[in-house]
Design a protein with these regions (language model features):
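N-terminal pre-ligand scaffold of iron-sulfur
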Residues: 1-66, 81-82, 96-113
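Short cysteine clusters
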Residues: 49, 73-76
């Protein structure tokens, strides 16, 4: 099945560094996603831990560790690299978050779902 480009949010809605969680609809299905902005780059992922399949955040829009160097799963503290979603610490080490290719047009972030 081919992917569908979906509008996520405006680029300026996310601090740098920072993150934002969203629920988006594509093909009549709701999907939890989140966007991370760091050093003016944006990365989008499905909001699902590879270990438990539950959401990574326990506080809305809080996906990064205290130093904003890693994406962190609030359930068990797993740490994921921001740029590629690779788990570098925790029970799902070496697994990856599902990355969603994203683009920015007219300061609006879109992702392929």
């Amino acid at each position: 099945m081919s992917s569908i480009e979906t509008r996520l949010c405006h680029y300026d809605e996310i601090p740098d560094p920072g993150s934002k969680g969203l629920v988006v609809e594509a093909r009549n299905t709701l999907t939890r996603v989140f966007v991370v902005k760091k050093d003016q780059q944006v990365y989008a992922y499905e909001n699902s831990c590879p270990h438990t399949r539950g959401p990574l955040d326990w506080v809305p829009d809080r996906f990064l560790d205290e130093d904003a160097n890693y994406i962190m799963c609030a359930n068990h503290g797993a740490l994921f690299q921001i740029g590629d979603g690779l788990c570098v610490y925790g029970p799902c080490k070496n697994d990856r978050l599902r990355a969603l290719p994203c683009t920015i047009r007219n300061r609006v972030i879109h992702a392929q779902l």
